[in-house]
Amino acid sequence: CKAGCVIINAVECEPYLTADHQLMLEKADEILVGVSILMKAVNVTKGYIGIENNKPDAIKLMTEKAAQYPNIEIVPLKVQYPQGGEKQLIDAVIRRQVPAPPAIPINVGAVVQNVGTAYAVYEAVQKNKPLFERIVTVTGKSVKNPSNFLTRMGTPMSQLIEAAGGLPEDTGKVIGGGPMMGK
């Protein structure tokens, strides 16, 4: 199997998460360089960045910045869970369906990476910086100041919750990973 394109998943994988959105608004140029590096690494000439259409500011900014990259296309996507699922994303962006397992994206010519990965590739290649931190969303009805935090991997959730203003005493449960698939 040969890759024909790189697809960047800029769809938040879970409702209420905003880390990818913030990353695009703050690091659009770096993400696009990362996509270019990924395209070169897998020897393809076409890249796509799929962004849900409820993020018009990110779509606008990424489209403006991508004008310098004729082989990278920003693809607005309808908001539909699980739009960020790899197979759903491939179908929405390039209209190809990944067959049942053991088939994988490369079987339909796609290499899929997350927007955070594109940024991490930029940092690794251009700045020689290893991956040791990422943006994390802390949100929910009980969180006093829902926020995104650039945090080192391994940071305890309790520290992030405190940074977001803490939780009331009667909070029943803290879920790590998102409301749909988290634990």
Region roles according to the model:
Residues A3, V44-K46, T171:
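A general structural motif
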Residues T45-M157, A163-P168, G178-P179:
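Hydrophobic alpha-helical positions that pack around
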